[in-house]
Regions:
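Positively charged, low-complexity terminal tracts
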Residues: 1-6, 13-72
């Protein structure tokens, strides 16, 4: 069984960066880590931005967009 999750582009990019950064690595158990790796892989397949030469700028814009939308 699978599910579908819909994210805005900026949400997906910021989430991908969090997962790829391994900031959560030490704080989760193996089953959760495996699920996060699967999610990271799915996002990586969908996003072009991480492979862009101006990735840092695109990521900063996405972060700013989320702050404006949801607040701090």
């Amino acid at each position: 069984m699978s599910i579908t999750i819909t994210l805005e582009q900026d949400e997906a990019l910021v989430l991908f960066e969090l997962l790829a950064s391994e900031k959560l690595e030490a704080s989760v158990d193996t089953p959760e880590r495996n699920a996060l790796w699967a999610l990271e892989g799915l996002l990586e397949k969908q996003l072009a931005e991480p492979f862009s030469p101006n990735y840092s700028e695109l990521l900063q814009e996405a972060r700013q967009s989320l702050l404006e939308r949801y607040g701090r």
